Curated annotation (Swiss-Prot):
Family of the protein in this entry: Belongs to the venom metalloproteinase (M12B) family. P-II subfamily. P-IIa sub-subfamily.
Motif extent (Cell attachment site): 64-66
CC per GO annotation: extracellular region; plasma membrane
PANTHER family, A to Z: ADAM A DISINTEGRIN AND METALLOPROTEASE DOMAIN, DISINTEGRIN AND METALLOPROTEINASE DOMAIN-CONTAINING PROTEIN 28
Record InterPro entries: Disintegrin_CS, Disintegrin_dom, Disintegrin_dom_sf
Protein name: Disintegrin isoform D-2
Subunit structure: Monomer (disintegrin).
Keyword field: Cell adhesion impairing toxin, Disulfide bond, Hemostasis impairing toxin, Platelet aggregation inhibiting toxin, Secreted, Toxin
Note: The disintegrin belongs to the long disintegrin subfamily.
Organism of origin: Bitis arietans
Length: 83
């Protein structure tokens, strides 16, 4: 089935989906188009801060046990597993 903008599910072709335009509180996401607002790189994620990717080498997951700290890449909002 085709993606439905405004259902709060990130589907194929959507960059974000923050509910209906009346209910969306996300300044990084255009609720009418389900695309990021101009100048925004992201709208969520451990490596996203105020609509921008966090800088490379920013710790996004603290070391535990035998694992090392995990760091943002500066190119994604996801925190990669580096162990």
């Amino acid at each position: 089935s085709p993606p439905v903008c405004g259902n709060e599910l990130l589907e194929e072709g959507e960059e974000c989906d923050c509910d209906s335009p009346a209910n969306c509180q996300d300044r990084c996401c255009n609720a009418a188009t389900c695309k990021l607002t101009p100048g925004s790189q992201c709208n969520y994620g451990e490596c996203c801060d105020q609509c921008k990717f966090k800088k490379a080498r920013t710790v996004c997951r603290i070391a535990r046990g035998d694992w090392n700290d995990d760091y943002c890449t500066g190119k994604s909002s996801d925190c990669p597993w580096n162990h």
